[in-house]
C-alpha cells in the first residue's frame, strides 16, 4: 500500500515538473505569435501610395495668363482647373468649361515644368477639350481598355482644388450611366441629357475639373467634370460628383484631334425607354415589345422628314435593335451625316420601315 502511494507521489511530481518546465515556453510562444501578428499588420498598412505615384505625374494644372488693365498690363496667372496627359505627343484632355473663351493657356506639370498650350478642339456636349503642349519626356496616364468600372469600385480623384496644390481624394463608384445633370440642352434633339456619367463620392471641387479619376491600379477611369450642387430646400448635397467615362473621353479626344470638333449624326427625336407597356402592346401574345418611345419629333428634322411621329415605338435603327435611348442615340452619332438609314417602328398595331436621312448635329 505504501509502495503504491509512493509511486503515485513520484509520478505526480514528475508530471508537475514537466508542466512547470514547458508552461513558460508555451506562454512565450503564444505571446510571440500575437506579437508577430501585430507587427505584421502594422508593417503592411492599407495604402494607395504606389497607385497615386503611378498616375499623379500625368495630371496637370491648367492656368490662364491674362494681361491686367488695372496693373499696367502686368500678366495675371489664374487657376482654371486640371488636365490629364493622354499621349507622349503632348495631348492633354480637360473640360470644355475649364478652357472655354481663354486666350492664353499655361500647363504646369507635377515635376515643375511649365508650358504654353494651344487648343486643339472642344466639345460642349461632353464637356471635353483637347489642348497640346510641345514637350519631351511627358508622363502619360495608364489606360486599360479591357477594364470596366463597376459600382463599388474604389477610385481616387486627382486634381488641384482651389489651387492648393495637387490633391488626392478617395471614394467609390456610386453609380454608372447617370444622365441628365447640367449638360441637358433641352432642344428635344435626343441629345439633351444623353451623356453617360460615372457618379462618385470622391470629393470633386473647383480646380478638380478636368483631372483624373483613377482606380487602385492607377489606371484612368474617367475625367472629373462636375459636382452636383442643386439641392432642394437650400441644402448643399455632399459626396455627389461626376466623371466622364474613359471610353467616351478617348473616343471624343480622337475625333477632336482628327477634325478639331466632333461630327455627330442627328435624327431629331427625343425618346424614352419603352417600359411598362400594356399587355396588348406586344408583337405577339407572349413577347413584350422592346424599344424606344418617340416623345418628341423636331419639326423639319430628319425624323420628321422621314415620316416618324410622336408616339411611335422605335424598334431598330440601321439594322440594330433599339435597346435603350443612350445606345440608340450613340448609334446615331456614329452615322455619317447624309447617310440614309432604315428605321423600323411600331405605330399602333402596325409595324413599318421608314427611310431617314441622317443630318449633322446642329451646333448651338
How would you label these PLM feature ranges?
Residues 1-33, 50, 118, 132, ...:
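C-terminal recognition in membrane/secretory proteostasis and scaffolding
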Residues 67, 88, 103, 122-126, ...:
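Short, conserved beta-turn/loop elements at beta-strand boundaries and strand-helix junctions
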Amino acid at each position: 500500500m505504501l509502495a503504491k502511494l509512493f509511486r503515485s507521489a513520484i509520478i505526480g511530481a514528475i508530471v508537475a515538473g514537466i508542466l512547470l518546465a514547458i508552461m513558460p515556453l508555451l506562454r512565450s510562444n503564444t505571446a510571440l505569435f500575437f506579437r508577430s501578428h501585430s507587427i505584421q499588420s502594422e508593417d503592411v498598412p492599407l495604402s494607395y501610395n504606389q497607385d497615386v505615384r503611378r498616375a499623379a505625374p500625368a495630371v496637370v494644372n491648367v492656368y490662364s495668363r491674362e494681361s491686367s488693365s488695372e496693373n499696367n498690363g502686368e500678366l495675371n496667372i489664374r487657376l482654371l482647373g486640371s488636365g490629364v496627359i493622354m499621349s507622349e505627343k503632348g495631348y492633354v484632355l480637360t473640360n470644355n468649361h475649364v478652357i472655354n473663351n481663354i486666350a492664353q493657356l499655361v500647363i504646369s506639370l507635377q515635376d515643375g515644368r511649365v508650358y504654353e498650350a494651344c487648343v486643339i478642339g472642344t466639345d460642349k456636349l461632353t464637356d471635353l477639350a483637347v489642348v497640346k503642349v510641345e514637350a519631351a519626356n511627358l508622363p502619360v496616364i495608364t489606360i486599360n481598355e479591357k477594364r470596366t468600372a463597376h459600382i463599388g469600385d474604389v477610385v481616387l480623384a486627382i486634381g488641384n482644388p482651389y489651387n492648393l496644390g495637387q490633391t488626392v481624394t478617395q471614394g467609390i463608384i456610386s453609380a454608372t450611366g447617370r444622365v441628365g445633370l447640367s449638360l441637358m440642352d433641352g432642344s428635344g434633339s435626343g441629345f439633351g441629357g444623353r451623356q453617360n456619367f460615372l457618379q462618385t463620392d470622391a470629393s470633386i471641387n473647383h480646380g478638380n475639373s478636368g483631372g483624373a479619376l483613377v482606380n487602385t491600379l492607377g489606371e484612368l477611369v474617367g475625367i472629373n467634370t462636375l459636382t452636383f450642387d442643386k439641392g432642394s430646400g437650400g441644402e448643399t448635397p455632399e459626396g455627389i460628383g461626376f466623371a466622364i467615362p474613359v471610353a467616351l473621353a478617348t473616343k471624343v479626344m480622337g475625333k477632336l484631334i482628327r477634325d478639331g470638333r466632333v461630327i455627330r449624326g442627328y435624327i431629331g427625336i427625343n425618346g424614352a425607354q419603352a417600359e411598362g407597356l400594356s399587355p396588348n402592346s406586344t408583337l405577339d401574345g407572349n413577347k413584350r415589345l422592346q424599344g424606344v418611345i418617340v416623345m418628341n419629333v423636331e419639326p423639319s428634322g430628319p425624323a420628321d422628314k422621314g415620316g416618324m411621329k410622336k408616339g411611335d415605338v422605335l424598334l431598330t435603327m440601321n439594322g440594330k435593335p433599339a435597346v435603350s435611348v443612350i445606345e440608340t442615340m450613340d448609334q446615331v452619332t456614329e452615322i455619317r451625316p447624309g447617310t440614309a438609314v432604315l428605321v423600323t417602328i411600331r405605330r399602333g398595331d402596325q409595324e413599318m420601315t421608314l427611310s431617314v436621312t441622317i443630318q449633322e448635329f446642329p451646333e448651338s
